[in-house]
Amino acid sequence: MIPSSKDDTDLFDLNQTRETILETSPDLIINAAAKVGGILANNTYRAEFILDNLKININILEAIIDNPQIKLINLGSSCIYPLNASIPTKEESFMTGKLEPTNSPYAMAKIASIEMGNALKMQYGHKIIN
């Protein structure tokens, strides 16, 4: 296992993300990277939450696009499920209703990363678990 933090790799920088992956040659990447915040931050910096989280996930996926042997576990979040989802939440409720308004930009970025991962699986044969 080769842990990596934001101090090791700037995931906003595609070249640095690629370099880290090439240098470490991982068999598996567990993507838990995200810009997160509380209710105040989520409401105040809505654009930053969606843009920054999209950049992080796009860079990780672009960095592995030419390396289909690298497996990726792309972690989601409870916020990707509808506001009125039953508790305990069932996977079948994904994309069946309105998201919690305070964190919908973050949730949409996570949902986009799931769809991007599915696209890489279908088009390039990557082994990605969302």
Which role does the model predict for each range below?
Residues M1-T20:
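Adenosine-cofactor binding site in Rossmann-like domains, unifying the SAM/SAH pocket
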Residues S4, I29-K35, L72-S78:
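SDR active-site strand-loop-helix element
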Residues N15-L54:
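NAD(P)H-binding glycine-rich loop region in Rossmannoid oxidoreductase-like domains
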Residues S25, P68-Q69, G125:
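Residue-level detector of structured alpha->beta connecting loops
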Residues I58-N103:
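Conserved Rossmann-fold NAD(P)-dependent oxidoreductase catalytic core, especially the SDR/UDP-sugar
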Residues G76-S77, M116-N130:
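Conserved beta-loop-beta element that borders a ligand/cofactor-binding pocket
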Residues P105, A109-A112:
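Active-site helix of classical SDR
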